[in-house]
Amino acid sequence: MLGSLRKEKPQFIGSMTALITPFENGILDVNSFKKIVNHQIENGTDGLIPVGTTGESPTLSHDEHQKVVEVCIQESSGRVPIIAGAGSNSTKEASKLASHAGKAGADAVLVVTPYYNKPTQSGLYSHFMSVADAAKIPLIVYDIPGRSIVPVHDSTLVKLCENHELISGIKDATADISRPPRLLRLIGRGFSQLSGEDATALPYLAAGGHGCISVSSNIAPKLLAEMHDAWNNSNYNKAFENHLKLINLHDAMFCESSPGPVKFAAERLGLCKSEARLPIVEIEATSKSRIIRALKECNLI
């Protein structure tokens, strides 16, 4: 039996991209970012996520963070939903970023579990409730214990949905494909369940998920959009064909600390320079060779 907390259709579905943030000589490269936004939309991406982990949000100033969100919203012109990153391990800071995103016209905010300070489940609940109050737009909970240490328990998600109508979904980077059916039963079909792991995107769909917030789609937006479209149209062979084609690319995107690999790939495709901010550094020659092989396998170069 499906849960009754979220009965309507999920608001956010399909192939979504956790956008990189391009730099040139240490400065935001706004023109390249605009090009990336249009490249994504023109190749079928269903939603864009600026200033998340892949967008190097921890090393952006608040002014830069807000600028990237504003440019993404303006350049996309309502063609696809914008889910703005608003994560911080400070509830006050996350609330400020979320409030700005809402006022700027974002469709939702993506809020990561607070990292480093290891809050209890009660602390997580209070954090997300406070940020949702500040955002005044839908909030996607970003559960990534590999980076944040503390996981968001299913019971905490249920409690959030019971007590705040703007808690609208999850970006699940746990790679636990048993979770979508659990949350369908506990919360309902209207709670957007988005994989945060490229390699498990298709299994996540098969388990009842609704889409993926992807790193690889910075590089292969069309292949990933086609995979999701094929799945949604019951063309499972085509979906699996694209999934197999992309596996080595998914692996290559994390051969070193992200977003180093994806930025190198973006430079190879002429999207922007590979420059990242410290402590992310230029990737090793062996990693570059591995990425080039993966790009060739996907017929991207």
Regions found by a protein language model. Name each.
Residues 33, 65, 69, 94, ...:
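A general structural signal for well-ordered alpha-helical segments in protein cores
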Residues 37, 69, 128, 164, ...:
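Short amphipathic alpha-helical/adjacent loop interface patches that line ligand
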Residues 74-80, 104-105, 135-137, 162-166, ...:
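Short helix-capping segments at alpha-helix termini
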Residues 2-17, 21-24, 28-149, 159:
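Active-site beta->alpha loop and helix N-cap motifs at the rims of alpha/beta catalytic domains
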Residues 3-5, 11-22, 39, 43-45, ...:
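C-terminal alpha-helical cap/extension of soluble enzyme domains
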